[in-house]
């Protein structure tokens, strides 16, 4: 499955290139240059100055045209604007190169479907950069919730205004992370979706603030709120369960579990010292950088011929739900399973 020349050994480092050296692409180059099982071959960007600076920093090659990079690598990380994902992604896959592409997988559902098909037709790995899956806080949260009965989940993802990612709405920039997470955690067909949104400026093309409610067949209710204009950065998921309340802070890598117990009194010769109403558990999490874990996983999948934990099929389902949420926020319509087969949009059990 690997795109290897006859003279290369299976145990040689995976040769990787980075296409698109904006903010995220520079981080990809940085991490890849540190991975022991990867060899950063080169970078490509429309900005010659930026591309050459990054290449010089990591002592690799710079390519004005990314097509010239493809014969030299086994895999690429694509961090170009979303509108270019389809063209660049399909070109790389057809060239026999494995692909990690930043989220969202594509600008439209049709383009995403073709990317998934192209990867399958050419027997190439297609991983999508839903980086929160590799956040230590999420990985520990998923372990905790496997032993709980979830009633409702709240996901809050807020950021101050920035010039970054202004070519998409807050749904595709920020909320899409939590959509992917919720689908993974709940693992049940969707039966209802409602959403509302707002813009900083009425003339703005894209929504800056969106809140959505998703009803699942198993009874779980998920409420997602994302903002690009909040004066405080926030990345939190709260799970209301029958036996606990779990709060996870993805920014500070912290998980707290609150449990109510039968009230106990501690006494000293008949004198009440204190009353115990409940207790808080703090879950241990590692300090590994999520991007490091994500790229290491990608390299291992290429080396070992394994499908990634966040492949094209999963990312396509996430994109479908994100598109429906944005549409619902724009027109105010509530979607139910009787109106649209939401079961086909995201059945997390197939993740």
PLM ranges: what are they?
Residues 220-293, 311, 339, 344, ...:
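NAD(P)-dinucleotide binding in Rossmann-like oxidoreductases
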Residues 106-165:
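A contiguous active-site-proximal alpha/beta segment in oxidoreductase catalytic domains
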Residues 162-221, 226-232, 238:
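Rossmann-like dinucleotide-binding domain that binds NAD(P)(H)
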Residues 1-10, 75-77, 124, 297-351:
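C-terminal helix-rich "cap/oligomerization" subdomain common to oxidoreductases
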Residues 28, 58-116:
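Beta-loop-alpha module in the N-terminal Rossmann-like domain of NAD(P)-dependent dehydrogenases
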């Amino acid at each position: 499955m690997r795109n290897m020349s006859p003279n290369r050994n299976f145990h040689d480092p995976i040769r990787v290139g980075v296409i698109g050296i904006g903010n995220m692409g520079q981080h990809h180059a940085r991490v890849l240059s540190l991975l022991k099982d990867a060899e950063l071959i080169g970078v490509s960007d429309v900005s010659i100055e930026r591309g050459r600076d990054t290449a010089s920093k990591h002592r690799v090659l710079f390519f004005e045209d990314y097509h010239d990079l493809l014969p030299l690598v086994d895999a690429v990380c694509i961090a170009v604007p979303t509108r270019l994902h389809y063209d660049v992604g399909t070109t790389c896959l057809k060239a026999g190169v494995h692909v990690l592409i930043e989220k969202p997988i594509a600008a439209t559902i049709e383009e995403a479907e073709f990317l998934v098909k192209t990867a399958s037709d050419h027997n190439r790995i297609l991983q999508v950069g839903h980086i929160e899956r590799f956040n230590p806080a999420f990985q520990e949260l998923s372990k905790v919730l496997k032993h709980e009965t979830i009633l409702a989940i709240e996901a809050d993802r807020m950021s101050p205004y920035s010039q970054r990612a202004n070519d998409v709405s807050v749904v595709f920039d920020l909320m899409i992370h939590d959509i992917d997470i919720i689908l993974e955690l709940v693992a049940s067909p969707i039966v209802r979706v409602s959403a509302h949104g707002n813009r900083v400026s009425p003339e703005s093309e894209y929504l800056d603030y969106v809140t959505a409610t998703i009803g699942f067949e198993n009874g779980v209710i998920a409420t997602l709120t994302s903002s690009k204009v909040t004066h405080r950065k926030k990345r939190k998921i709260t799970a209301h369960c029958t036996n606990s309340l779990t709060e996870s802070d993805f920014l500070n890598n912290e998980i707290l579990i609150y449990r109510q117990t039968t009230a106990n009194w501690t006494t000293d010769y008949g004198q009440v010292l204190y009353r115990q109403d409940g207790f808080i558990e703090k879950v241990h999490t590692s300090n590994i950088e999520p991007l490091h874990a994500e790229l290491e996983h990608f390299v291992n999948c290429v080396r070992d011929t394994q499908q990634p934990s966040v492949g094209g099929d999963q990312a396509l389902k996430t994109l479908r739900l994100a598109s429906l949420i944005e549409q619902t926020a724009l027109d105010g319509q509530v979607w139910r399973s009787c109106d649209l087969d939401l079961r086909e949009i995201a059945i997390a059990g197939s993740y």
